[in-house]
Structures are given as structure tokens and as C-alpha cells.
């Protein structure tokens, strides 16, 4: 009975160490490709400026989908543009992540009800990992979303699907409204 005969289990020391090294390398060198379509693209460009210095997080923007592992969809996705979004997503190598930035790409924005030409959320055509709300969201919000993507990468394991990792991340997230309400109750008591 050698090491290979024993089989690979979820809690194997070797696999756990490999998971940690791979995840550290992925989250420390995140290469996003911006797909700016409207107002949110201006905030995305501001985030890439020297004021916020994304390179300190290991985030270096790329212009080719074949070199990127994160797609930032920012702005209103029209029906004509949807085909191009899917094509770019399919050209990205695995593992690939998608961050939807702003109300328009999250749910259609102000055009959701009467805009027949607007897609009611980019998640209808490609899987989205992290949503950043706002119209348009501030650069700080985008940085928070990028850090959520890094948390998601940190939690990935060999043999565990991304859907399970997303569930774990959602369980760890704290709703600020709950924290404020708990603090109010503590002050009243």
C-alpha cells in the first residue's frame, strides 16, 4: 500500500497544501479584463488610477480575455452586446470569475422595466460570482468586490464546486443592518 494506492481524500495533507499554494498564487495575481459599457466604466477607470493603486492587491488589468482570469462587466448590457460578452467569457481560461458592477449590469438598472433592448442582468447569459451594487458604484465598492473575489479564490478546494464555496462565503458575510440593529439593542439594554 503506497501513497497512490490510498487514494485522494478531501482532508489529505498534500492536497490541502497544494490548495493553499494554488489559491495564494491565484488571489495574489488577479488579472481582470474590464468590459466597460456605460457610466460604471468611468468609476472602473478611476479605480485603476494611482489614487487607489490596485497593484498593491496584485491586481493588474489586462486587455485580452486570453490573459485574464476575471471579467469586470460594468454598465448597461444591451441585447446586441450580450453576444460579445458571452464570446469574451468563453475565450477566458479556467478558472475564470465574473464581477458584475453597477445596477445596470446587475439587474438592468433604470431600464429594467421599459427597456426592451437592455438585458435584465448579465447573470442571464454568464455566471456571475460577485455583484457590486450602485449607480455607479464608487471605486471603494469595486475594491470591496475585488476583495470578495479574492476571498472566494482563497476558499476554493480541489474536489469542491464553486457553488459550495459561494455558499460558504455567503454564510461568512455579515449584513451591516443586522450589526447596527444588534448594537442598538445592546445600547437600549
UniProtKB/Swiss-Prot annotation:
UniProt record, GO biological process: aerobic respiration; electron transport coupled proton transport
Annotated catalysed reactions: a quinone + NADH + 5 H(+)(in) = a quinol + NAD(+) + 4 H(+)(out)
Localization of this protein: Cell inner membrane
Entries under PROSITE patterns matching the protein: COMPLEX1_20K (PS01150)
InterPro entries, A to Z: NADH_UbQ_OxRdtase-like_20kDa, NADH_UQ_OxRdtase_20Kd_su
Bilayer topology: Peripheral membrane protein
Highest taxon, organism lineage: Bacteria
Pfam families: Oxidored_q6
Binding locations of [4Fe-4S] cluster: 39-40, 104, 135
Enzyme Commission number(s) of this protein: 7.1.1.-
MF annotations from Gene Ontology: 4 iron, 4 sulfur cluster binding; iron ion binding; NADH dehydrogenase (ubiquinone) activity; NADH:ubiquinone reductase (non-electrogenic) activity; quinone binding
Cofactor requirement: [4Fe-4S] cluster
Class of enzymatic activity (EC top level): translocase
GO cellular component, one term: respiratory chain complex I
Protein keywords: 4Fe-4S, Cell inner membrane, Cell membrane, Iron, Iron-sulfur, Membrane, Metal-binding, NAD, Quinone, Translocase, Transport
Textual note on the cofactor: Binds 1 [4Fe-4S] cluster.
HAMAP family, per the entry: NDH1_NuoB (MF_01356)
UniProt family annotation: Belongs to the complex I 20 kDa subunit family.
Subunit (UniProt): NDH-1 is composed of 14 different subunits. Subunits NuoB, C, D, E, F, and G constitute the peripheral sector of the complex.
Annotated function: NDH-1 shuttles electrons from NADH, via FMN and iron-sulfur (Fe-S) centers, to quinones in the respiratory chain. The immediate electron acceptor for the enzyme in this species is believed to be a menaquinone. Couples the redox reaction to proton translocation (for every two electrons transferred, four hydrogen ions are translocated across the cytoplasmic membrane), and thus conserves the redox energy in a proton gradient.
UniProt protein name: NADH-quinone oxidoreductase subunit B
Amino acid at each position: 500500500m503506497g501513497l497512490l494506492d490510498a487514494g485522494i481524500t478531501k482532508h489529505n495533507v498534500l492536497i490541502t497544501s497544494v490548495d493553499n499554494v494554488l489559491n495564494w498564487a491565484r488571489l495574489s495575481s488577479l488579472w481582470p479584463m474590464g468590459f466597460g459599457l456605460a457610466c460604471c466604466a468611468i468609476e472602473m477607470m478611476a479605480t485603476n488610477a494611482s489614487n487607489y493603486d490596485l497593484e498593491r492587491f496584485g491586481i493588474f488589468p489586462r486587455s485580452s480575455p486570453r490573459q485574464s482570469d476575471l471579467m469586470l462587466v460594468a454598465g448597461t448590457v444591451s441585447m446586441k452586446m450580450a453576444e460579445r460578452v458571452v464570446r469574451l467569457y468563453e475565450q477566458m481560461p479556467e478558472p475564470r470569475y465574473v464581477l458584475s458592477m453597477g445596477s445596470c449590469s446587475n439587474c438592468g438598472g433604470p431600464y429594467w422595466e421599459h427597456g426592451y433592448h437592455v438585458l435584465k442582468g448579465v447573470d442571464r447569459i454568464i455566471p456571475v460570482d460577485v455583484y457590486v451594487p450602485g449607480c455607479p458604484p464608487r471605486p471603494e465598492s469595486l475594491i470591496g468586490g475585488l476583495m470578495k473575489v479574492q476571498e472566494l479564490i482563497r476558499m476554493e478546494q480541489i474536489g469542491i464546486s464553486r457553488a459550495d464555496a459561494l455558499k460558504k462565503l455567503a454564510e461568512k458575510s455579515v449584513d451591516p443592518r443586522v450589526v447596527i440593529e444588534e448594537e442598538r439593542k445592546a445600547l437600549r439594554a
